[in-house]
Amino acid sequence: MRLHFLSELTLNTFIMDKKRVYTFGNGQAEGKADMRNLLGGKGANLAEMNLIGVPVPPGFTITTEVCSEYYELGKDKVVELLKADVEKAIANIENLMNSKFGDVENPLLVSVRSGARASMPGMMDTILNLGLNDEVVEGLSRKTGRPRFAWGSYRRFVQMYGDVVLGMKPVNKEDIDPFEEIIEKVKEEKGVKLDNELEVEDLKELVKRFKVAVKEQTGQDFPTCAYEQLWGAICAVFRSWMNERAILYRKMEGIPAEWGTAVSVQAMVFGNMGDTSATGVCFSRDAGNGEDLFNGEYLINAQGEDVVAGIRTPQQITKIGSQRWAERALSLIHI
């Protein structure tokens, strides 16, 4: 019995002492490129980019091992194990960004992203603009002088959080998306066809109706506490490791389930602040044929999901990319 007790004590000490959170920012990082098994591809590369001087928003990565602990120990225990380290890491971001998580006048907003050791594009979930609520959005509007940007970001956040964390994302193609249904209804009422034609007051109305939909579908009010939002998002990313899309993709690609996913939390950088902001994606090689050619695409005044949503046509980053895009377009016209 004594030996059993000692082994449990040793195990509990190991569980409590294990490093689970790795920070990065301001040219420093606790991780590096060869730690992708522990930090995932995204977390390891974010750390390495900091170390080589690439300007990267500060943040932290929760290890892939915690994903396994999430399924072994449960949500409450994992939050307990992470709480002190995550709060310390958030304080580090606050210091580097000169802003405060959950603060009304000078808010820090963050993104929460997945990151397995092997690339699994589009299979798991992301949440942007986390930290907003009805008071913080007004503070962000005053701070930036851009109410449309602030309320547009809030609208996106409520929709993404509802989809990813609260489970409101449609499962099948025939399922009705409650948020898209509301957007279409408001556009019809306002007599516009495009999302970007909606005014600030329309965006406020969208947020109001979104939160009503959350209450009706989940029985819960939309969370207003920044840390409650953060823990919900972190755990949702871990849950997404076992969603149907991810499981099927892993089977196709031969990726073991026990690898797990890391979670990277970063200070937000906004591509939707106006015509001098943009979001995009780039590659060091041509994804179609493997050619050693830098390429990519971007959208002005947009956020990440807009690039892949197919709602707007992105621009090519390079001149040769634009030329090739034009050639392909002409060939389709001739067909």
Regions from the PLM with identified roles:
Residues 14-332:
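Nucleotide/phosphate-binding sheet-loop regions of phosphoryl- and nucleotidyl-transfer enzymes
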Residues 1-15:
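Short, Lys/Arg-enriched N-terminal segments with co-localized hydrophobic residues
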